Amino acid sequence: MQIIGRKNEIEELETLYNSRKPEFVAIYGRRRVGKTYLVKELFKDRFTFWHTGLSPYDRERRYLMRDQLQTFYYSLQDYGLTGETCPKSWLEAFRLLEKLLKQKDEGKRMLVFIDELPWMDTARSRFIPAFEHFWNGWAAKHDNIMLIVCGSATTWMTDNLINNKGGLYNRLTSEIQLNPFTLSECEDYFRYQDIVMSRYEMVQAYMTFGGIPHYLNLFDKRLSLPQNIDALLFNRNAKLQNEFDRLFGSLFKNEEDYMKVVRCLAKRRSGYTREEILEATKIKDGGGASDILRALTASKFITPYLPFGQPKRIHYRLCDHFCLFYLHFLDKAEKPEEHFWQNNYMSGKLNAWRGYAFEEVCLSHIPQIKAALGISGINTKESSWIVRDANGKPLSQMDLIIERADNNVNLCEIKFYGSLFEIDKRYDATLRDRMQILINKLSPKQTVKLTTITTFGLKRNEYSGQVQSSLTLDNLF
């Protein structure tokens, strides 16, 4: 099958494969983002050894090390190891891998791929010292070895490989963080799969599933977008109905605390400070809380940001599109309503949600917005701002503020609308008030440029003149 997007990653991996020295590559990113698919489709029949760690989800932890060693032994046998018994330790297991690779060594590049490496590091298994010894003591001494490891547990990958302070310090020759598809890559994917969909619908698909290839791969091209959403999320035996629990259960130990934080952040689009999160979730302050926030950030479920005008008040907001959708529509439903999306497609509830979700899509495509504004080469800082009164009541909301190094500031109004967006007299007054509030907060040398980001553009009338730039959903592709 064709690999959609990933051009930079493909070029880097091919360059590393063709080098004449040992290479140690770590690929990490959110679960379901396509790490394994990329390696499998790129290298196809060039693997010397391939092993996938055993998922700990729904397994008894006391047997995990035994089971991990057993499956590793089976992989060794699949690739030709004979005359050996199942190893009882990871030192012994990697010694058997060395033996297998020596048998296969013909002087050509030998590609070793270990998928879901973090799952193999079970409690008290001493996996890391054995893995360090395999690389430092043997693999790194062979110029024809290329070792690729993958993992969805991003913090494990960063702590134990990328930022390792022990035996693997500075041993990686390359690290690749694989991100979800952009809208443009989703469009390429749908076209490749012969799925006919307008960009208007593609944006709504992105609101629901994000750019996660695995979810998009489940689409049935015979169905409309509402039918696909129902089939995957709301109908009986929907394939993704339990995905939220499975996702966190496979990524994190003690996943309940991680899910508490995510559920907390789903309640307010602007997010919360660390202190507010701990108070709402009852998670104790300390290293554990920091680890949770760091892990969720590294896995791209949440993002830290500084709200406009609050340079020392870091907030965290939920940014994973699938989680946002799931927690809004499915989390509290004892039994999801069959055909919910089709039955409510034009309802006020769904239209209101689309407005919020479109803002998140725009925040996921800042580089595309900057390119459309012609400011890709200018340093910028992006934020949002909810203006509140003395009692904390919201007075005004600014969806996206782009502060530029050239002393211009784009105040972006984001609207998801079924036709051309029209500014009437009342909304014109609202926009002027927002601009004045922002101007009062900025330096006198800064210029505010009102910018709209809408689905199909701005209707020209007597009130549209103050808009300096008008972008549409096409600019996000």
Identify what each model region corresponds to.
Residues M1-G348, L450:
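Phosphate-binding site recognition
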Residues F308, I314-F477:
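A cross-kingdom feature that marks ATP-driven nucleic-acid transaction machinery
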